[in-house]
Amino acid sequence: MQKQRFCLDTTAITDSDVRKSLGVSNISESAEKIMDIIAQARVQLDISCHIPYDTVYKELVGFLTREGCAPETLIKVDTWLVKKTPNRYEIKIPAEIFYEYIKDLRERINKGMRISENAMYETALEAYILSKPDEKDREDVLNEVLSKTVNSFRVKYRNALRGGTLDSAPDLDVLLLAKELDAAVVANDEGIEKWAQRLGLRFVNARDFPFILQEYLDLWDKK
């Protein structure tokens, strides 16, 4: 049987869906539970869980530290997650993937520009409507209109440019390391999932990951 390897994104440990699936209320509890299952799977079944170093590793440790996780949990992260830097100079990626990525990025930039233009038109129109009836104070009009428009713009712009694509070095490192090791990608990130599929990589949703490992362990215990 081929050795099972998993490559973890930060969301594999920190995502809110993971906490819900485990029935816990905070990251400290969910991180400790997941790390205990990973440890058992490593010792009993030789299943290895990898994390890109230092991009994703630093991101994960920083997040857990800010959330007040116990030092013991951070020690488990260091002990049971295999830290490795992807061999970025040797991993071969088909040129078609780069073509698709650039095309996707260009479409997103154009969409973001259209959203920006619409936001400016909406701001001007609302400012005119609000100021006309009773000649409101100029600053009040600007504050009222801009706060509303900017908040709406941020949401739309973020979704247009970042939703469903790779938008950070850690995201890319997860895919590169998974390809190098022939490992399954574990994440709760639409962009990582989309590009994992395009690269022909196995993908496991973060909320399902602990239960998959537990299923392996339960079956082993029945032997």
From Swiss-Prot:
Pfam families: PIN_5 (PF08745). Keywords: Endonuclease, Hydrolase, Nuclease, tRNA processing. Its EC number is 3.1.26.5. It catalyses: Endonucleolytic cleavage of RNA, removing 5'-extranucleotides from tRNA precursor. GO terms for biological process: tRNA 5'-leader removal. The keyword Cell inner membrane does not apply. InterPro entries: RNA_free_RNase_P. One of its GO terms (molecular function) is ribonuclease P activity. Belongs to the HARP family. RNA-free RNase P that catalyzes the removal of the 5'-leader sequence from pre-tRNA to produce the mature 5'-terminus. This is RNA-free ribonuclease P. It comes from Methanococcus maripaludis (strain DSM 14266 / JCM 13030 / NBRC 101832 / S2 / LL). The lineage of its organism: Archaea, Methanobacteriati, Methanobacteriota, Methanomada group, Methanococci.
